[in-house]
Amino acid sequence: MIHADQLSKEFGRFQAVKNASFQIEKGEIVGFLGPNGAGKTTTLRMLTGYLPPTSGTATIAGFDIVKNPLEARKHLGYLPEHVPLYDDQRVTEYLKFRARLKGISSRQIWPAVSKVVEQCGLDPVRRKMIRTLSKGYRQRVGLADALLGEPDLLILDEPTNGLCLLY
């Protein structure tokens, strides 16, 4: 599913990630652990195609993240550390918009949105404007977005940030 070979990222003279190599197979659950500044978020951003590596290669479902980023992204859902949301949309409007961007067919959009709204506990806020949501609910909207389309791979950066324990 994911194959990284000697993945590195430099910012000027600072080396954020140095020669990271690993494989993650379908069905595996993996976490990156390390102190602040260890390169965890940078590695995730490279894997998702949001930040090009300085050197090395990585593939998702066999697609190179640099040469075929759109094909690679079709196989993943990504929840970044800081969730970029459109504050001037209602929760379900935003999720329908994101579903269209992900290529979900018109007749499947509402069932897909309904499913992730339920999975992420968003029903109480589904009609609210995103700008009015708490940090925890904003995080849930980001997770719902990542789950849209039932991706083969889910990449979560600080997924519990702002979430309250349920019961």
List each model region and its residues.
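Walker A (P-loop) phosphate-binding loop of ABC-type ATPase nucleotide-binding domains
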Residues: P35-G39
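Conserved ABC ATPase "signature" region
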Residues: K96, R100, R107-V125
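Catalytic Walker B motif of ABC-type/P-loop ATPase nucleotide-binding domains
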Residues: L154-E158
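Conserved ABC ATPase signature
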Residues: M129-L133
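Hydrophobic anchor residue at the start of the ABC signature
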Residues: L143
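Conserved ABC transporter NBD signature motif
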Residues: G56-K67, A72-H75
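A short, proline-enriched helix->beta-strand linker immediately N-terminal to the Walker B motif
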Residues: L148-D152
